[in-house]
């Protein structure tokens, strides 16, 4: 990270602090935390906007970190196979847990919220690939929720997208239709679909719906980002090309440099 970028971020945070009643000493402390977080994020492109948004979120007395987690899809060698759906500890939760524990070491006042992606069960094509009904999907997600509660630190909160953000699934479907129809997004969707093609083929999505599925993923990231930015929170996410949609939403986020596909 170039030194001039850090200087510009610090000046921006100092201005934010002056206008929002943040004591000057907290700016220096936040800058130290930002450097620590950057060292944890792996090889992602980190710019001034990313750092500024994250710094502003860290000024909160109790920063909320929302952690979206896929259901307990089958996996092998640390990568999802999507052969079936189980009701135990999800792979992504297991990969996020050590990252979050490290984050808490220098952010002891942070509030961790695990968000199980129960809304993914609303995709008929995904349920068909997993050979499960909607009822079974939801039941297994609840089983995973209980398993995480038993496994994680007691002060972490474990919930689902539907519980935390009522109406999230419907809103995401509506946004997906808008994104899919917008000409300005066509090239971006095509590029993201190309990156995700191996994943789609693993699930069994026909090529004719792959771009549409990418629009739905983009909408989920946008909708989550907009919800979290409203509470000045932070999102913790795995490595994925879809992180760019968080930038569109204006939300602060950190990348746990793990791959699951």
Task: Please provide the spans of the model-predicted regions.
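N-terminal regions that are enriched for targeting/export leaders
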Residues: 10-92
């Amino acid at each position: 990270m170039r030194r001039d970028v850090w200087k510009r971020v610090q000046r921006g945070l100092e201005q934010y602090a002056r206008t929002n009643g943040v004591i000057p000493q907290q700016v220096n402390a936040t800058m130290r935390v930002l450097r620590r977080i950057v060292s944890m994020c792996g090889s992602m492109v980190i710019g001034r906007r990313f750092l500024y948004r994250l710094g502003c979120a860290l000024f909160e007395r109790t920063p909320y970190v929302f952690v979206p987690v896929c259901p307990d899809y089958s996996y092998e060698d640390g990568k999802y196979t999507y052969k079936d759906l189980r009701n135990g500890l999800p792979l992504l939760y297991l990969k996020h847990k050590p990252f979050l524990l490290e984050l808490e070491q220098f952010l002891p006042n942070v509030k961790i919220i695990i968000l199980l992606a129960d809304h993914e069960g609303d995709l008929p094509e995904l349920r068909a690939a997993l050979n499960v009904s909607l009822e079974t999907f939801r039941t297994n997600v609840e089983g995973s929720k209980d398993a995480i509660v038993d496994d994680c630190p007691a002060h972490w909160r474990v919930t689902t997208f539907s519980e935390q953000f009522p109406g999230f699934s419907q809103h995401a479907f509506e946004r997906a239709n808008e994104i899919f129809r917008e000409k300005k997004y066509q090239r971006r969707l095509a590029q993201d679909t190309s990156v995700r093609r191996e994943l789609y083929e693993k699930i069994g999505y026909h090529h004719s719906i792959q771009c549409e599925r990418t629009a739905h993923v983009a909408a989920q990231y946008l909708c989550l980002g907009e919800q979290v930015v409203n509470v000045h929170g932070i999102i913790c996410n795995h490595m994925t090309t879809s992180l760019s949609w968080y930038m569109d939403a204006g939300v602060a986020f950190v990348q746990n440099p793990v791959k699951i596909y």
